[in-house]
Swiss-Prot record:
Primary site of residence: plastid
Note on how the cofactor is bound: Binds 3 Mg(2+) or Mn(2+) ions per subunit.
Record protein name field: Alpha pinene synthase, chloroplastic
Keywords: Chloroplast, Lyase, Magnesium, Metal-binding, Plastid, Transit peptide
Pathway(s) it belongs to: Secondary metabolite biosynthesis; terpenoid biosynthesis
Residues annotated to bind Mg(2+) 3: E532
Biological role stated in the UniProt entry: Monoterpene synthase involved in the biosynthesis of volatile compounds. Mediates the conversion of (2E)-geranyl diphosphate (GPP) into alpha-pinene.
Motif (DDXXD motif): 381-385
Co-factor(s): Mg(2+); Mn(2+)
Subcellular location: Plastid, Chloroplast
GO terms of biological process kind: alpha-pinene biosynthetic process; diterpenoid biosynthetic process; green leaf volatile biosynthetic process; monoterpenoid biosynthetic process
Origin: domain of life: Eukaryota
């Protein structure tokens, strides 16, 4: 699977502190209109050969050249509709109200030592941190969260913790919740602390008894903690198996609708497909109906303020994202990319991918840049699948030399793609120079050259009918998946300078980057291999595995690959959460892109094939505001 110049925002962001003007004087957010008379109408491609009944067609161009193309469904999101989005929550009054609520919640954190006792202070600290994180407002309280977790960690032990600092016995709920939150904040906590509860609480699995809500919440927090696993942590594998079985058994017996909804959400999305924006929208919906069930450790008045802030913050960010989506849409239309019918038009989906994990208003360049580069990689993907091998070799030469004159004799729409691609890479380099204090264009270009080489190798395999081993395929596929090239420049655009040494810990050849690319390739192949085979692209993880294991079938291959994905995601957890020199904001945004990919490929190819799930995600995240 393979995975922008535009006009400035119409107005400043809302609120003097919550969101600041971010777009002005930024090359990513300006464009020069393209003057190409030959592209004032769609490029004509007349179908003269019957389509394959599944996903393949042959077309004959006006020049008399026959090509094979995938019958990709059209863009689901009309660009005129995107331009009409109202951005209702950009008014300053909303930002001012949000700032007041942020102060109130900050006061809640500061008052924790006054309102908690030695019998419940630990669970109160953890519950408040957990609530602001689930509601998607934790970025406003990073100092307060650190203070709260430092306090909890002071009393952490190998035997776990109880509700309060003077508790004589550890309890499952506080220990499991503490383990999860502390690990996610890079505190050193061992999974062995949970072993006692996996053994002790086995009797909860008695499905003949009416489930106790407190017990269910305990097991739910143990399940959530078990998902933050590192390689070799068998206790977490056991805990996951135990808790999943238990929760599925008791789910039909739960009378509390909101608790039932939370369990269903966690079972369905787990950790690696649960992106921050989706989690926030889901918990806002759940809390909005009744907050009293969620935690006995936080006063309902506090929950009312948390919920109001979460709703307001979600809608304010959504208005910003609508502006960014309009910027992306204008770039798309005015660059003429929308007129290239052979390729997938998925710029909206790619923006969703970036925006569900990267929420900070000041990181517009990250979100828009990622969406632009990803859309262009998809064009290259479809182009390499469509065009004659000799044409592709010329196009590849032009990219590796960054010289448009080389493609003078190629079709006009290849020139369109090259120009848009070249401009996007240069614009992102200008943006990165502001934060890095140096020119990173050559560095980025070299990454693209390596990527193009990997793509050429796959084109050669397709042209010659060569079937590589799984090892050979994955070694090349980690590069051709495109993850590195679409994340590198957006990460460099973040407001954290990265030295060469630090860059090596997050970019190639780091294990972190390798795992991001590998899991993308593996998950993409398990969802797309049948459709690609219908288009004549038979080389995939599945077919390579079957070649290596004569007598095996698709089910065998998928079982092996899904197990491999699970293990590599555990290793990715470790690489993400281990202590190193990489700023967490850089690693975190890259990690969330991985989670976004896992989400959009959760059940099927959420990019190539029409998916009501993806359409609903886009509506809930970026179009439908939350009633306040």
């Amino acid at each position: 699977m393979s995975l922008g110049c535009i006009t400035p925002l119409a107005s400043a962001m809302v609120g003097p502190k919550l969101v600041r003007p971010l777009i002005h004087h930024n090359p990513l957010f300006h464009h020069k209109p393209l003057n190409r008379p030959y592209l004032q109408t769609k490029i004509p491609l007349r179908s003269r050969v019957a389509q394959n009944p599944i996903n393949m067609a042959l077309i004959t161009t006006d020049e008399g050249i026959t090509r094979r193309i995938g019958n990709h469904h059209p863009n689901l999101w009309d660009d005129d509709f995107i331009q009409s989005l109202s951005k209702a929550y950009e008014a300053p009054s909303y930002g001012e109200r949000a700032e007041k609520l942020i102060k109130d919640v900050r006061d809640m954190f500061n008052a924790l030592p006054l309102h908690s006792s030695s019998a419940d202070d630990l669970i109160q600290h953890l519950s408040l941190v957990d609530s602001v994180e689930r509601l998607g407002i934790d970025r406003h309280f990073q100092n307060e969260i650190k203070t709260a977790l430092d306090y909890v960690y002071r009393y952490w032990s190998d035997a776990g913790i109880g509700c309060g600092r003077e508790s004589t016995h550890a309890d499952l709920n506080t220990t499991a919740l503490g383990f999860r939150i502390l690990r996610l904040h890079r505190y050193s906590v061992s999974s062995d602390v949970l072993q006692q509860f996996v053994l002790r609480d086995g009797p909860f699995l008695d499905s003949n008894n009416q489930p106790n809500e407190d017990d269910i919440k305990n097991i739910l927090n143990l399940f959530r903690g078990s998902l933050i696993a590192f390689p070799g942590e068998n206790v977490l594998d056991d805990a996951k198996s135990f808790t999943m079985t238990y929760l599925k058994q008791v789910l039909p017996k739960i009378s509390n609708l909101n608790l039932s909804r939370e369990i269903k959400f966690n079972l369905e999305y787990g950790w690696h497909t649960n992106v921050p924006r989706l989690e926030a929208r889901t918990y806002i919906d759940i809390y909005g109906e009744d907050s009293s069930w969620a935690s006995k450790s936080i006063n309902n008045i506090f929950y009312t303020k948390l919920l109001e802030l979460a709703k307001l913050d979600f809608n304010i960010i959504q208005s910003l994202q609508q502006q960014e989506l309009q910027i992306l849409s204008r770039w798309w239309m005015e660059s003429d990319l929308g007129k290239l019918d052979f390729a997938r038009h998925r710029h909206v989906e790619y923006y969703l991918w970036a925006a569900t994990g990267c929420i900070e208003p000041k990181y517009s360049a990250f979100r828009i840049g990622f969406a632009k580069l990803s859309a262009l990689v998809t064009y290259l993907d479809d182009m390499y699948d469509t065009y004659d091998f000799d044409e592709i070799k010329i196009f590849t030469k032009a990219i590796k030399r960054w010289d448009a004159s080389i493609i003078k004799g190629l079709p006009e729409f290849m020139k369109v793609a090259f120009k848009a691609f070249d401009e996007a890479v240069k614009d992102m380099a200008q943006e990165a120079k502001k934060t890095q204090g140096r020119d990173t264009l050559d560095y980025a270009r070299k990454a693209w050259e390596v990527y193009i080489d990997a793509y050429m190798k796959e084109a050669e395999w397709l042209a010659t009918g060569y079937m590589p081993s799984l090892e050979e395929y994955l070694e090349n596929g980690k590069v051709s998946a495109g993850s590195r090239v679409v994340t590198l420049q957006p990460i460099l655009s973040l407001d954290v300078p990265l030295s060469d040494d630090i860059l090596k810990e997050i970019d190639y050849p780091s294990r972190f980057d390798e795992l991001l690319c590998l899991t993308l390739r593996l998950r993409g192949d398990t969802r797309t291999f049948k459709a690609e085979a219908d288009r004549g692209e038979v080389v995939s993880c599945i077919t390579c595995y079957m070649k290596d294991h004569p007598g095996s079938n698709e089910e065998d291959a998928l079982n092996y690959l899904n197990s491999l994905i699970d293990e590599r995601l555990k290793e990715l957890n470790w690489e993400y959460l281990k202590t190193d020199n990489v700023p967490i904001i850089s690693k975190g945004n890259a990690y969330n892109l991985s989670k976004g990919l896992q989400l959009l490929y959760k059940e099927r190819d959420g990019f190539t094939v029409f998916s009501i799930e993806t359409k609903n995600f886009i509506y809930r995240m970026m179009i439908g505001s939350i009633p306040i």
